[in-house]
Structures are given as structure tokens and as C-alpha cells.
């Protein structure tokens, strides 16, 4: 296995200018060779059509695999222990599995994400949102109208509390889960910090699973515990990874969706007015946010199982590949005025939840959370506005997801 194509660009681990970076990369085409943290080369897929082609289901003749054994650099020992993206590639579970194993693992967790089960979570989410809005109102009153970080107080708490309810996370472990999930997405922190937080997360998951074995409840973790061993693939190791993946996939990306939708509406008051007038649906806002912001960022990793040509690039067997959901959502060959936030656009096509075999299992839950959270927020705070110039609000550190480090707002008057 060889990987000879040189990297033409460096993928910024801080993610501070993701849109500008993507446009600089795009000048070289829809498939661009980049350098990841630690100097490891990879391809970034920027083109919508190229991403669809790469991600489509090919059970008999796949182009790419999630199995790290296909990565030339890893096999050759060029990826050090503690490399910040390694934890995205080495854990045994749905995220790193290929068919048919992926199908077995997905079916293990799938019953928790049926339309009926998601519908049952609606009142739970509504209560979480209402409670967060009450907490914000109390904090705003005590602070006498000072600036509030909406990301910290609302955008992230809603999904982490929802995932906690889905999994049955005990209150005493919630903080550890939060720090561990953050570490997975922050490509700017040191390997030592990332490893420590990730280790603490795995320890907390082990503790929770042990408690569910002793005293199962009505939650996804307990459902998985009850079916351990019913198939060869249903092992404790995979159970732990399934819980970790549910936390990771359901937390920051959904928080970014809410964050970016609020940001988009506050910076496009004409569209916010149309939503309030009933001329634009919240579904349209959510779909356009997923396209425009690409909240899943640059998602690692896939590996070429053979040489192939895609988007004018010659991919070699053993090459690493990331799909840029920011890039695919702003592909000018697919979308008219790709940089414009416009929930009235005719097409709602986006790859915000992936495509093909690894399409996000929790997509309906993420959409439901946003559909509950966004109208409740804007109804409670009709005068909500940004407290800083939009161009000065920093990006969340890391290139794996796309949100803000903070979302400073003035809440304005509260509607009872």
C-alpha cells in the first residue's frame, strides 16, 4: 500500500476559519490533499457529487472502508499512540464497522430510534427545553440583563440532557460524559489532555453499564445490556462503544445545529420574520442550517481499499479520507448562491446527516430537538439578539464539527 500524493494544504486543527479554508481548498478541485494533525496526509472531499459517490452503498465492490487496517500510514507505524484522531478509527463499533457487521451493530441500537420511540421522547425534550428557558430567565434577571452565552446555557444543554434521558445517564456521571465528548471533537487540545478526558469518559460509561447490569431501567443502555450476547457481535466492548457513539453523535452536532440555526436567523432578520409569520417552516430552517453550516464539519476517517479516480484525483489504496460536510453543503456546482443562508431555496438536499451505510441513526432525534428548541426559544424571547458583531464570534476549536465557541446574546424581554 502506498500513499505518494503530497499534501498541498494544512488542515487547521483550530478550525478558526472553516469557510475561508474550504474555499481556498476548493480552488484545487473537489478532492484536495491535506495534512492532518501530526503531519498525516489525507484527502478531503469537498464536492457534493463526489461525496455521494464515495459514500454510496457498495456491498460487493467497496471503494473505501472504515477499518483502520486499510490505512497505509497506520500499518507502517507512522501514526503515534495518542494521535488526536486515532480514537475515531480504532474503537470497535458502528462508526468503524463495514457491512455486514455494521448492519448487525446498527440493528442492535436501532429500536431506540424508531419513529414511535422518538415520538415518546417529545414530551421529555419539551420539558428539558422549558426548564432551560426558565433557568435562563432566572439567570438573566439576576444578572440585570447582561450578556448570556446561549451556546453554554441552551444550545448544548438541550442535547446532552436529551441523550442523558435516552441512555439513562446518572446525574453524578453527566459532567464526565460532557468533558469526554468535548475532547473527541477538539482537535486543538494536546494528546495528553485528550487521552485523559477520553479515558475518564470510558470509565464513566463502564460504571454506568455496571449499574444497569445490576439495576436495569427503561433506557437504551438497559436495552443493550439485556440483549448482550444474543448475537456474536453483541459484546460488552461493542456495547460500551455504542453508548460512547450515541453520546458523541447526539451531543455536539445537535448543539451545533441549534447554535448555527439561531446564529443564522439572528443575522438574517428577514428570514426570522418570515418564520414568525408562518411563511417559512422550521423544517426548512433546519434543513438549510444543515446545508449552510455543515455542522458535522470534516468527519474522519475512511480508507481507500483500492486505487480509484474521483473528482479528478487519483486515490491510492491505503489513503485516508475525510468528508467535509461544510464543503459539500457549499458546493457551487450543486447549490445556487451556496454561501447564502436561504431557507426558501427550492432544494433541501444536504448531506448533514451523512449518506449511505453510515447515515446518522439519530437524525430524526436531532431534528426533533431542534424543532422543539428553536420555536420555544424565539417565542420566549422575541427580542433575542446577538451581543457582538457576528464576525467577531469565534468558532468552536477543532475541525471535526462546526459551531461557535460561544454565542453571546441579549435575551431581551421575556414572554410569559
Identify the function of each model-found stretch:
Residues 1-416:
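Cytochrome P450
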Amino acid at each position: 500500500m502506498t500513499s505518494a500524493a503530497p499534501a498541498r494544504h494544512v488542515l487547521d486543527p483550530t478550525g478558526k476559519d472553516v469557510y475561508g479554508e474550504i474555499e481556498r481548498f476548493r480552488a484545487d478541485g473537489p478532492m484536495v490533499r491535506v495534512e492532518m494533525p501530526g503531519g498525516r496526509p489525507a484527502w478531503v472531499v469537498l464536492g457534493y457529487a463526489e461525496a455521494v459517490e464515495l459514500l454510496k452503498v457498495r456491498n460487493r465492490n467497496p471503494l473505501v472502508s472504515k477499518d483502520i487496517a486499510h490505512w497505509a500510514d497506520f500499518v507502517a507505524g507512522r501514526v503515534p499512540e495518542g494521535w488526536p484522531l486515532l480514537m475515531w478509527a480504532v474503537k470497535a463499533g458502528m462508526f468503524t464497522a463495514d457491512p455486514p457487521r455494521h448492519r448487525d451493530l446498527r440493528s442492535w441500537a436501532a429500536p431506540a430510534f424508531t419513529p414511535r420511540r422518538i415520538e415518546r421522547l417529545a414530551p421529555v425534550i419539551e420539558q428539558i427545553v422549558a426548564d432551560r428557558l426558565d433557568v435562563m430567565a432566572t439567570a438573566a434577571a439576576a444578572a440585570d440583563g447582561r450578556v448570556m452565552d446561549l451556546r453554554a446555557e441552551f444550545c448544548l444543554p438541550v442535547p446532552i440532557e436529551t441523550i442523558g434521558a435516552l441512555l439513562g445517564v446518572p446525574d453524578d456521571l453527566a459532567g464526565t460524559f460532557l468533558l469526554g465528548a468535548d475532547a473527541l471533537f477538539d482537535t486543538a487540545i494536546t494528546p495528553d489532555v485528550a487521552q485523559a478526558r477520553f479515558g475518564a469518559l470510558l470509565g464513566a460509561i463502564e460504571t454506568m453499564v455496571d449499574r444497569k447490569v445490576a439495576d436495569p431501567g427503561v433506557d437504551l443502555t438497559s436495552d443493550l445490556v439485556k440483549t448482550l450476547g444474543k448475537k456474536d457481535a453483541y459484546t460488552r466492548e461493542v456495547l460500551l462503544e455504542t453508548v460512547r457513539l450515541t453520546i458523541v453523535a447526539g451531543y455536539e452536532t445537535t448543539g451545533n445545529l441549534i447554535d448555527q440555526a439561531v446564529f443564522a436567523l439572528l443575522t438574517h432578520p428577514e428570514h426570522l420574520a418570515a418564520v414568525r409569520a408562518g411563511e417559512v417552516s422550521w423544517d426548512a430552517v433546519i434543513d438549510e442550517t444543515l446545508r449552510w453550516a455543515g455542522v458535522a464539519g470534516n468527519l474522519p476517517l475512511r480508507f481507500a481499499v483500492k486505487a480509484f479516480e474521483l473528482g479528478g484525483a487519483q486515490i491510492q489504496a491505503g489513503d485516508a479520507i475525510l468528508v467535509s460536510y461544510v464543503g459539500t453543503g457549499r458546493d457551487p456546482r450543486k447549490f445556487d448562491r451556496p454561501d447564502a443562508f436561504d431557507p426558501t431555496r427550492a432544494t433541501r438536499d444536504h448531506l448533514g446527516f451523512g449518506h449511505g451505510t453510515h447515515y446518522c441513526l439519530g437524525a430524526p432525534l436531532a431534528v426533533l430537538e431542534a424543532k422543539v428548541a428553536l420555536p420555544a426559544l424565539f417565542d420566549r424571547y422575541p427580542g433575542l439578539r446577538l451581543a457582538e458583531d457576528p464576525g467577531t464570534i469565534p468558532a468552536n476549536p477543532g475541525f471535526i464539527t462546526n459551531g461557535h465557541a460561544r454565542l453571546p446574546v441579549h435575551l431581551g424581554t421575556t414572554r410569559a
